[in-house]
């Protein structure tokens, strides 16, 4: 049941056109901003029904004019099963079920979500935390990858990217995080673009802070 866009799975456009979207183990406003914006747009423009299985109604759910199925942590499996045949929620082949990473900690919950999708015809999508990391990989943000996730060592990939960019792409991999820190401290690099990174989460927090201070532009 779990499918990606290439196999006819869930896209942003599908979220906007769905009659009902069920959220389980997921708070879009906090964990998946693009999904939240699409659902808010759909609820306002089309009247899409957003149903959240959660312990409480979040501010994000209120912004989507959503409906809460109040569920104590650990009881999600029973709550999901209760949606079968429940006319008030209108879950059918026009619906989408979005499952967050937290649901994996609840015994039987993922199976229940798959069962709900199979019996109603609804589409099911898994939304892991930090889902944007996959987008960064596809954009070539790892030192040994080019856009599209193709290796820098792949000569054909370098030719393709070079043709699009109008440059000769070197075969030498870029710097990883530790390499960037070292280059900033040595003066080899002068500028730094940083986002969503806590120095305390790096291999050497003190060196990372020193590198940020050493950069001429951040």
Stretches found by the model and what they are:
Residues 1-38, 42, 46-90, 103, ...:
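Extended redox/cofactor-interaction regions of prokaryotic respiratory oxidoreductases
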């Amino acid at each position: 049941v779990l499918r990606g866009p290439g196999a006819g799975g869930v896209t942003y456009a599908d979220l906007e056109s769905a009659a009902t979207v069920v959220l389980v183990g997921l708070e879009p406003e906090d964990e998946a901003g693009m999904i939240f914006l699409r659902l808010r747009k759909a609820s306002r423009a089309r009247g899409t029904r957003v149903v959240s299985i959660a312990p409480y109604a979040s501010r994000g759910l209120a912004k989507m004019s959503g409906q809460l199925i109040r569920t104590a942590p650990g009881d999600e499996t029973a709550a999901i099963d209760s949606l079968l045949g429940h006319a008030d929620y209108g879950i059918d082949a026009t619906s989408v079920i979005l499952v967050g990473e937290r649901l994996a900690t609840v015994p039987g919950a993922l199976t229940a979500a798959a069962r709900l999708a199979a019996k109603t015809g609804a589409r099911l999508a898994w939304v892991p935390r930090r889902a944007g990391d996959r987008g960064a990989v596809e954009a070539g943000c790892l030192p040994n990858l080019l856009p599209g996730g193709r290796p820098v060592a792949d000569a054909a990939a370098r030719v393709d990217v070079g043709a699009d960019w109008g440059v000769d792409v070197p075969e030498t991999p870029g710097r990883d995080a530790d390499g960037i820190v070292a280059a900033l401290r040595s003066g080899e690099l002068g500028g730094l673009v940083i986002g969503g990174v806590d120095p305390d989460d790096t291999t050497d927090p003190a060196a990372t802070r020193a590198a940020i201070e050493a950069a001429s532009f951040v």
